[in-house]
């Protein structure tokens, strides 16, 4: 019926009906397109709309990055600035991950607080970390983002500028809680992460580095695993981002995290069983890098990251040991992928320490590692001291009463349990050796220089003094670079690649006679006739120049 109160004719009615249907179809298409985009993608659209306002333009924000060399950041800062806020990442997870539906608890029972600590990070890299997180995370589960500026000196306005920029972009459009914290002085990653976690209010806490890019569907597989075990800690499989080209590459599902007796992190190879497939979560002795997620309550019950550790280094290893020994587990979840820049060296300085013979970075590492050894390794701490004798003179200014009380209350296992059930590779390495550590002759130690095939005697307190391992079965004397001490033509002592066949091994076989090192093939002994020189000579039972002692002997000497 039209305005005059009369019914329309068939032709007019058809016209109105068709027009009405076209309008409905138009609005339906708009609705579907909007519904397909996540709230974070709507946020990105809002960013583009607001580029007319300089204070909301991300390019203006990035332009305030202090001028400095690429060496400072240890990645390609110019390319990072050119990439913009977000980029399309390759699909690196197994195809079955994209077709299965994760079984998740209700959002209120599984909301996540994300803690990102940074120190002198480039603006574009930090912003890309944040935006990739927001654009690829389900809004209902992402509860809050806590950003901790650990006393950045090069860019002191970064946090305030970021706060204004994000406030202008978000306004009231997003329910995500935002917390901005700044340490007035450098406190370190460990202290900063603990500070963020103490203020978090989500069920779970995710620790994320500030030079990452999260990939599609990264959160749901982690939440699904955590819902099955409240004492579990999970890590995504990290895809490496090349620091020079910023190319995003697929990570390796056949690697797990571990460490050696020097308490350095290492990737360990793993073998798939007949029941396992590449996309299945798998247990790991340690975290793969510093990206991990667990129940906030469980994290706090375990004492958080050890607050006595300084600045950076060892915190993930300490937490991993603590988790496994005190009733927890660690899993790597290959269906969850996060890109991570592994820098070739530290992009920050360590504060000066007390020992002038060590660099600040070396002393900080030894300080933190010594705390881990004294806290958790029990009688196996002697392995650490054998390989890192300089740690003995590092002072520790606290006791372990609180830690021992926690170990007793939680009925934590001894470290022997970890070797048997979690990291048999570490136990195997221990069982393979008859002696290890520095090899000392009086006040000097046998040292293999990087670019020289002939070993010498040098100060035992060199920061890179060679650590030797005497293999129990083969009698080979090996460095960590898998170079073996050998005797060649003319009785010349040299370093050679450790041999696998018996012919090569003969020239590399040594026998312990008391404190002497007898070369099995020549029946001569290692000798030190001059201050820094090594040679082979006839064995003399009481010759001090032929007395060589390992830092740690695992079996009685012949």
Swiss-Prot record:
What cofactor does this one take? Mn(2+)
For binding substrate, which residues are annotated in this chain's numbering? Answer: 150, 186, 210, 312, 343, 346
Entry-listed glycosylation sites = 48, 111, 501
Has keyword Membrane? Answer: yes
Q: Which residues lie on this side of the membrane: Lumenal?
A: 33-558
Catalytic subdomain B, as annotated region: 281-343
**What is the E.C. number?**
2.4.1.41
Q: In which pathway does it act?
A: Protein modification; protein glycosylation
Q: Which GO terms describe its cellular component?
A: Golgi apparatus; Golgi membrane
Please list the reactions this protein catalyses: L-seryl-[protein] + UDP-N-acetyl-alpha-D-galactosamine = a 3-O-[N-acetyl-alpha-D-galactosaminyl]-L-seryl-[protein] + UDP + H(+); L-threonyl-[protein] + UDP-N-acetyl-alpha-D-galactosamine = a 3-O-[N-acetyl-alpha-D-galactosaminyl]-L-threonyl-[protein] + UDP + H(+)
Which ranges does the record mark as transmembrane?
13-32
Q: Which stretches make up the Ricin B-type lectin domain?
A: 422-556
Function summary: May catalyze the initial reaction in O-linked oligosaccharide biosynthesis, the transfer of an N-acetyl-D-galactosamine residue to a serine or threonine residue on the protein receptor.
Name of the molecule in the record: Putative polypeptide N-acetylgalactosaminyltransferase 13
Q: Which organism is it from?
A: Drosophila melanogaster
């Amino acid at each position: 019926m039209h305005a005059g109160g009369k019914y329309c004719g068939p032709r007019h009615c058809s016209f109105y009906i068709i027009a009405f249907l076209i309008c409905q179809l138009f609005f339906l298409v708009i609705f579907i397109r909007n519904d397909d985009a996540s709230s974070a993608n709507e946020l990105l659209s809002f960013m583009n709309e607001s580029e007319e306002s300089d204070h909301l333009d991300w390019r203006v924000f990035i332009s305030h990055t202090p001028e400095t060399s690429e060496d400072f950041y240890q990645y390609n800062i110019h390319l990072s600035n050119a990439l913009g806020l977000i980029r399309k990442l390759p699909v690196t997870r197994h195809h079955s991950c994209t077709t299965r539906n994760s079984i998740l608890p209700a959002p209120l029972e599984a909301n996540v607080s994300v803690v990102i600590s940074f120190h002198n990070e480039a603006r574009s890299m930090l912003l890309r970390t944040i935006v990739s997180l927001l654009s690829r995370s389900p809004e209902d589960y992402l509860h809050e983002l806590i950003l901790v500026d650990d006393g950045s000196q090069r860019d002191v306005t970064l946090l305030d500028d970021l706060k204004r920029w994000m406030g202008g972009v978000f306004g009231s459009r997003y329910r995500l809680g935002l917390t901005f914290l700044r340490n007035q002085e450098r406190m370190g990653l460990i202290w900063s992460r603990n500070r963020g976690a103490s203020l978090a209010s989500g069920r779970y806490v995710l620790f994320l580095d500030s030079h990452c890019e999260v990939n599609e569907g990264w959160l749901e597989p982690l939440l699904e695993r955590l819902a099955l075990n409240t004492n579990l800690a999970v890590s995504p499989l990290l895809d490496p981002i090349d620091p020079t080209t910023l190319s995003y590459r697929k990570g390796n599902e056949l690697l797990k995290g571990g460490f050696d007796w020097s308490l350095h992190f290492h990737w360990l190879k793993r073998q798939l069983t007949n029941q396992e497939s590449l996309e299945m979560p798998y247990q790991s002795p340690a975290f793969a890098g510093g990206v991990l997620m667990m129940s906030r309550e469980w994290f706090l019950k375990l004492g958080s990251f050890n607050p006595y550790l300084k600045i950076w280094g060892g915190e993930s290893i300490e937490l991993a040991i603590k988790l496994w020994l005190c009733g927890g587990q660690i899993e790597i979840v290959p269906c969850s992928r996060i890109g991570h820049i592994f820098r070739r060296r530290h992009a920050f300085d360590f504060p000066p320490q007390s020992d002038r013979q060590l660099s600040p970075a070396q002393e900080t590492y030894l300080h933190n590692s010594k705390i881990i050894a004294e806290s958790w390794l029990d009688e196996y701490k002697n392995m650490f001291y054998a390989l890192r004798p300089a740690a003995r003179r590092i002072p520790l200014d606290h006791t372990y009463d609180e830690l021992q009380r926690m170990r007793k209350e939680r009925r934590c296992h001894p470290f022997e349990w970890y070797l048997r059930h979690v990291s048999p590779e570490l136990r195997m390495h221990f069982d393979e050796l008859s002696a290890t550590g520095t090899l000392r002759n009086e006040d000097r130690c046998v040292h293999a220089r990087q670019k020289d095939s002939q070993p010498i005697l040098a100060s035992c307190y060199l920061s890179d003094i060679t650590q030797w391992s005497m293999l129990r079965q083969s009698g080979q004397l090996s460095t960590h670079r898998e170079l073996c001490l050998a005797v060649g033509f003319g009785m010349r002592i040299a370093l050679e690649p450790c041999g696998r066949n018996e012919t090569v091994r003969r020239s590399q076989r040594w026998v312990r006679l008391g404190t002497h090192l007898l070369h099995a093939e020549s029946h001569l002994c290692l000798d030190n006739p001059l201050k820094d020189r090594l040679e082979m000579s006839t064995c003399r039972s009481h010759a001090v120049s032929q007395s060589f002692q390992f830092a740690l002997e695992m079996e009685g000497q012949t």
